[in-house]
UniProtKB/Swiss-Prot annotation:
Chain segments annotated as transmembrane: 38-58, 95-115, 134-154, 199-219, 220-240
One term of GO molecular function: proton-transporting ATP synthase activity, rotational mechanism
Subunit structure: F-type ATPases have 2 components, CF(1) - the catalytic core - and CF(0) - the membrane proton channel. CF(1) has five subunits: alpha(3), beta(3), gamma(1), delta(1), epsilon(1). CF(0) has four main subunits: a, b, b' and c.
Functional summary from the UniProt entry: Key component of the proton channel; it plays a direct role in the translocation of protons across the membrane.
Subcellular location(s) of the protein: Plastid, Chloroplast thylakoid membrane
Gene: atpI
Main location, first listed in the record: plastid
Name the UniProt record assigns to this protein: ATP synthase subunit a, chloroplastic
Alphabetized Pfam families for the sequence: ATP-synt_A
Length: 247
């Protein structure tokens, strides 16, 4: 049996692909707790970018807006329109929450697509986008669940729980199950899409470096933005649903 150098190279490439992993965690030990440090580091980085950009752009508001001020005013209008469409006339208090969710997820996703986190060497583990960790997406989903429970209870009081037996008490188990499936779908949709995008890029780079992965990276930027929009839209829709009491 003849094994050519080409076939050996092909087998080696396939072996390298088989070694692609989701990633290793970098931990901090604080007291008796083990903390995913890479999530905190990259999350702080994203938050610093957001706060720094806003402070620089709007610290001196101009009557004739600068380009940066125009951009952030456009982003604010977009978030307000999104909140009003999904929540209704009482959208005002929820604009900061929906905006925070959208901007944090958007910048986190783009940081994973644009920044070479992997080249930063750690004692163990590796850095990645915050939304590439299931802990982050679950936390965001649980915050959304807490928000729509608060919205419903603050408007309707204990009568909010009547929704579980409407239109018929037979649907009680299904209505309760729905409150568990909402955060699950939010968290796993975001985590799965971001993780899949990064893995596809890693595999393509290992096969054909530099040229072929570039269109996939641009596609990743597009889908990253779409995922942030989907999460924010669903969060606003759930809040509006809890306040209006319709399904």
């Amino acid at each position: 049996m003849n094994i050519t150098p080409c076939s050996i190279k092909t087998l080696k490439g396939l072996y390298d692909i088989s070694g692609v992993e989701v990633g290793q965690h970098f931990y901090w030990q604080i007291g008796g707790f083990q903390i995913h440090a890479q999530v905190l580091i990259t999350s702080w980085f994203v938050i610093t970018i957001l706060l720094g950009s806003v402070i620089i752009a709007v610290r001196n508001p101009q009557t004739i807006p600068t380009d940066g001020q125009n951009f952030f005013e456009y982003v604010l209008e977009f978030i307000r329109d999104l909140s009003k469409t999904q929540i209704g006339e009482e959208y005002g208090p929820w604009v900061p929450f929906i905006g925070t969710m959208f901007l944090f997820i958007f910048v986190s996703n783009w940081s994973g697509a644009l920044l070479p986190w992997k080249i930063i060497e750690l004692p163990h583990g590796e850095l990645a986008a915050p939304t590439n960790d299931i802990n982050t997406t679950v936390a965001l989903a649980l915050l959304t669940s807490a928000a729509y429970f608060y919205a419903g209870l603050s408007k309707k009081g204990l009568s909010y729980f009547e929704k579980y037996i409407k239109p018929t008490p037979i649907l009680l188990p299904i209505n309760i199950l729905e409150d568990f499936t909402k955060p699950l779908s939010l968290s796993f949709r975001l985590f799965g899409n971001i993780l899949a995008d990064e893995l596809v890029v890693v595999v393509l780079v290992s096969l054909v470096p530099l040229v072929v992965p570039i269109p996939v990276m641009f596609l990743g930027l597009f889908t990253s933005g779409i995922q942030a929009l989907i999460f924010a839209t669903l969060a606003a829709a759930y809040i509006g649903e809890s306040m209006e009491g319709h399904h």
